[in-house]
Amino acid sequence: MKTIILFLTLLVISSSCTSIITKTMNSKETTYLDSPAVSPSIDQYLVDIHLGHSFLQGVMSFCYDCGKACFRRGKNLARCKKFVCRCTKSGIK
């Protein structure tokens, strides 16, 4: 009886430790899509932004992503039409 209780106790402790370890490892590997690019100077001068899209995504979702991409570059959204995203040349004022 004592061995069963000891075994179950060790099993619970080891499973809780592994869950804590995997939780911390997964949180370190998380990357965020809204974070700015590593080298923003490369695409800073681009006016047209080519985002990957699909027809299942829809125009509204594409234009939302277009506006977010312009904002990350410090530009205003000029036009989003027929899956073409255009930002203003001047920065946000």
UniProtKB/Swiss-Prot annotation:
Disulfide bond residue pairs: 63-80, 66-85, 70-87
Protein family membership: Belongs to the DEFL family.
Gene Ontology biological process terms in this record: defense response to fungus; killing of cells of another organism; pollen tube guidance
Name the record gives this protein: Defensin-like protein 210
Signal sequence, start to end: 1-19
Record's keyword terms, sorted: Antimicrobial, Disulfide bond, Fungicide, Plant defense, Secreted, Signal
Gene Ontology CC: extracellular region; filiform apparatus
Compartmental location: Secreted
Protein source organism: Arabidopsis thaliana
Primary location group: secreted
Domain of life: Eukaryota
Coiled-coil annotated spans: none
